[in-house]
């Protein structure tokens, strides 16, 4: 090793925890029938192979380490699926900022309110900010009233984290989502109505022609 150079620790290969690559002498072996036994690794491997399975070290830091007799291919698939499902369930909460002016018109207000509703339904927090310029800071109460109105319009979707605060030339308020309203799945498509009678599809029948007298 060259002096002054730091090398990252060697990554453990998953294959090192399978069959003959297991380096510990003794394991707590778990078998498909639910039985567990502390035994030499060689004996556990032999028993797993008799069952047509692999011996996989699933808890290398336990005392003694735990090894399980499984199909390694299926084990890897199940492990990746569990990791994928766990990542899907995780939601990183973000703070979405919406900026207003003290004289924000109704159209801009409604536009930003719709965005805030969507952000809250997605599980994110919303930070509404009123920015003051020049002498507008003398009317900071107008900005606070706007924020209170905004928070009141979102009570069905979020809860306010305290009263509006003035910091420098900005007033802001934080709104957290209501957990029961967080969208986790796509809405179901409405079912198509079934036609009750065949005649509705074919249209009205033609009346019979009058018979010749």
From Swiss-Prot:
Keywords: Cytoplasm, Initiation factor, Protein biosynthesis
Family label: Belongs to the IF-3 family.
NCBIfam families for this protein: infC
Gene3D superfamilies from the UniProt entry: Translation initiation factor 3 (IF-3), C-terminal domain, Translation initiation factor 3 (IF-3), N-terminal domain
Biological-process GO terms, alphabetical: ribosome disassembly
Record field: transmembrane: none
Cell location: Cytoplasm
Organism of origin: Solibacter usitatus (strain Ellin6076)
Annotated function: IF-3 binds to the 30S ribosomal subunit and shifts the equilibrium between 70S ribosomes and their 50S and 30S subunits in favor of the free subunits, thus enhancing the availability of 30S subunits on which protein synthesis initiation begins.
Subunit-structure text: Monomer.
Stretches for region Disordered: 178-213
Keyword field contains Amino-acid biosynthesis: no
Gene name as annotated: infC
Protein's recorded name: Translation initiation factor IF-3
One cellular-component annotation, GO: cytosol
Entry's Gene Ontology molecular function annotations: ribosome binding; translation initiation factor activity
Short name of one Pfam family: IF3_N
Keyword Protein biosynthesis tagged: yes
Biased segments, Basic and acidic residues type: 182-201
Stretches of the chain forming a coiled coil according to its record: none
């Amino acid at each position: 090793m060259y002096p002054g150079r730091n090398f990252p620790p060697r990554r453990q290969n998953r294959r090192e925890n399978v069959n003959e690559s297991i380096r510990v002498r003794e394991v707590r072996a778990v078998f498909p029938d639910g039985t567990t036994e502390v035994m030499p690794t060689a004996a556990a491997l032999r028993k797993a192979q008799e069952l047509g399975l692999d011996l996989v070290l699933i808890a290398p830091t336990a005392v003694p380490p735990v090894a399980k007799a499984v199909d390694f291919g299926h084990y890897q698939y199940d492990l990746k699926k569990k990791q994928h499902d766990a990542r899907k369930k995780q939601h990183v909460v973000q703070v979405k900022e919406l900026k207003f002016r003290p004289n924000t018109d109704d159209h801009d207000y409604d536009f930003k309110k719709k965005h805030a509703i969507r952000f809250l339904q997605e599980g994110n927090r919303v930070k509404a900010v009123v920015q003051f310029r020049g002498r507008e800071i003398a009317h900071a109460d107008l900005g606070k009233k706007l924020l209170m109105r905004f928070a009141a319009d979102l009570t069905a979707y979020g809860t306010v984290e305290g009263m509006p605060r003035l910091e420098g030339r900005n007033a802001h308020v934080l709104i957290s989502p209501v957990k029961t309203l967080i969208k986790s799945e796509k809405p179901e498509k409405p079912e198509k109505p079934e036609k009750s009678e065949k005649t509705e599809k074919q249209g009205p029948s033609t009346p019979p022609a009058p018979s010749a007298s």
